[in-house]
Amino acid sequence: MRRIFIPVVAAALALPAAAENISPELSLILQGQYRRGKNVPERAITGYWPAGHAHAVSRRLTLDETELIAAAQLGWSSRAQLNLALHDGKIEVEEGWLQTLGLGHGFTLKGGRFLSGIGYLNEQHPHAWDFADAPLMTKALFGEHYGQDGLQLKWVAPTGLFMEFGAELGRGRGFPGSERKGAGALFAHLGDDVGRSHAWRAGLSWLSTRAKEREAHFEDTDAAGPNEVAGLFTGKSRTVVADFVWKWAPEGNPQQRNFKFQTELFRRSEGGDLACASDVATSPCLGGVALGGLRSRQTGGYAQAVWQFMPQWRVGYRYDWLNADSKRYDPATVFAALDPANATFARYRPQRHSVMADWSHSEFSRLRLQFARDKSMQGVTDKQVTLQYVMSLGAHGAHKF
């Protein structure tokens, strides 16, 4: 699907500016940070299957993810957008999609690569976050966010109460699924104003995907080792996310003062088969070994509040928690090959407290200082300090509610 949609988006954005009813927009988002914390060689949330690799914290000023965004309104009927993320010398297509605007009756259809509409935070890029990093919930569920290569159909009801319903079908390339196994998502959002100063939005989302040999690093029980081996999970993954946001601004004007409360809760259930593989001759995982069934249930969430107490200045607090993962497997079979001390098998309740203060010179720049007490790794209390800047150059669309 990537071969079909992304070239189409790129071609659409390359149309001459003189074409009728086309208004191209270009923007560049620069992000940099200095972060100080414990030097942990390979970070992982204890008790949870790692969503990719997280390496040691860089203790110097670094250029973080840079975003290049190109968008265009293609007449009255459609819109195209391309988001490129540049980080550590690599370029990734985060989004590249075409969206219809003229289906009528509140319907829109989007095709290509896009951030899924599940939950609240998932559709937001890092520069739009209220904190310098993603919640533990997001990291455990998706790594950073969940993207689809596929189609999204959305309907906004023609009512006074905001009612949005959506369905997605994609190839499921992102964690917790794996390449080309397919994924489907459903979501519903409701919202309204309360008087002139308050507004709210609530949502419920469901994601279903499949994994084939989803990989993580483990240590085996080789007496001559231990060796690092690949743990492989093949099976189904189902995630339910509930979200709620409340905003306050005096008389609906957020320029002087405003307040935002935001929370999301999740439950993920997985079921399938576990295996391990190694090329070390003495490893019990040599050549690939089946370790039987694996069932798990995970829950958790986060809650945060951000208060703009005067123009340009904000403060915020966030609490993250993940409940101990409930797993069902045959210990005799699994631990004959894998070390039971592996962090993925631990019963532990990760949590983190974060406070931040930021100053915005204008809507195009922000400087943020954040402190966090991170206990997402068992036996490690990581006191983190982050100094971050975010700068936007060029036209940039308004952020969502």
Stretches found by the model and what they are:
Residues A14-A17:
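N-terminal signal peptide c-region/cleavage motif recognized by signal peptidases
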Residues R2-V8:
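Sec-dependent signal peptide recognition
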